[in-house]
């Protein structure tokens, strides 16, 4: 097996949208980094039945609604 071809696999802290935290192993960042989630299984519409509003990241949802709003109302 070749050496030094795999990414560094280390512990990071993951912070969920509700503030709860857990530690996991990942190739993200470097040892001890924190990954702040903007959406997680507790808030994602696919797992919550779609009852929560989508976050407007970068105005994408607003642009979509202004472009296709007439079709959505029908």
UniProtKB/Swiss-Prot annotation:
Q: Name one GO biological process term.
A: translation
Instruction: Note the InterPro entries from the entry.
Output: Ribosomal_bL28/bL31-like_sf (IPR034704), Ribosomal_bL31 (IPR002150), Ribosomal_bL31_A (IPR027491), Ribosomal_bL31_sf (IPR042105)
Tell me the Pfam families matching this sequence.
Answer: Ribosomal_L31
Keywords of this entry: Ribonucleoprotein, Ribosomal protein, RNA-binding, rRNA-binding
Its Gene Ontology cellular component terms are: ribonucleoprotein complex; ribosome
Molecular function as annotated in GO: rRNA binding; structural constituent of ribosome
> Does this entry carry the keyword Magnesium?
no
Physiological role: Binds the 23S rRNA.
Assembly behavior: Part of the 50S ribosomal subunit.
| NCBIfam families for this protein | L31, PRK00528.1
The UniProt entry's sequence similarity note says: Belongs to the bacterial ribosomal protein bL31 family. Type A subfamily.
Q: Report what the protein is called.
A: Large ribosomal subunit protein bL31
In which organism is this protein found?
Xanthobacter autotrophicus (strain ATCC BAA-1158 / Py2)
Per the UniProt record, the lineage of the source organism begins with: Bacteria, Pseudomonadati, Pseudomonadota, Alphaproteobacteria, Hyphomicrobiales
């Amino acid at each position: 097996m070749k050496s030094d071809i795999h990414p560094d696999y280390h512990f990071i802290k993951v912070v969920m949208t509700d503030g709860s935290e857990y530690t996991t192993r990942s190739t993200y960042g470097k040892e001890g980094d924190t990954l702040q989630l903007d959406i997680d299984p507790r808030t994602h519409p696919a797992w919550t039945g779609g009852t929560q509003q989508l976050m407007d990241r970068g105005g994408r949802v607003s642009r979509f609604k202004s472009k296709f709003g007439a079709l959505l109302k029908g």
